[in-house]
Amino acid sequence: MFNDKTIDIYIEGKEIKQIGEGLSFPADKILDGSRKAVIPGFVNAHTHAAMTLFRGFGDDMPLMPWLEQKIWPNEAKMTREDVYWGAKLACLEMIKSGTTTFFDMYQRPRVTADVT
């Protein structure tokens, strides 16, 4: 979008205060963003966060056999602590990949909320 221009982004604390050309503010740190993109955080509008614990578990199976034979029997055994640590892992992965907001659709929503 700004291929031929130098664009400055002034950040104060954790907040973007101003974006534009030739900004002049005191800086503790200056980063060269050449050949980089600045984008807003991603939003994951549908997740089952604690299911990160089931990643790769029967992933070669069709949906219904996978649910009936692998997922539902094991979900029935999940404890509050299992959901907590699965959701915590999911949150760390989402943060690492730029997700800033998510909507979880899994069991024990208050446990997932405790993670955040």
Describe each PLM feature range.
Residues 41-52:
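Histidine-centered catalytic micro-motifs
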Residues 21-24, 43, 55:
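Residue-level structural signal for beta-strand termini and adjacent loop
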Residues 53-85:
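Active-site gating loops and adjacent loop-to-helix segments of metal-dependent hydrolytic enzymes
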Residues 28-32:
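Conserved beta-strand scaffold positions in the cores of enzyme catalytic domains, especially
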Residues 34-41, 91:
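A generic hydrophobic-helix recognition signal that picks specific residues
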Residues 14, 35, 46, 98, ...:
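Divalent metal-coordination and catalytic microenvironments
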Residues 76-116:
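Active-site loop-helix segments enriched in His/Asp/Glu that coordinate
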Residues 1-26, 36:
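N-terminal metal-binding scaffold of metallo-dependent hydrolase/deaminase domains
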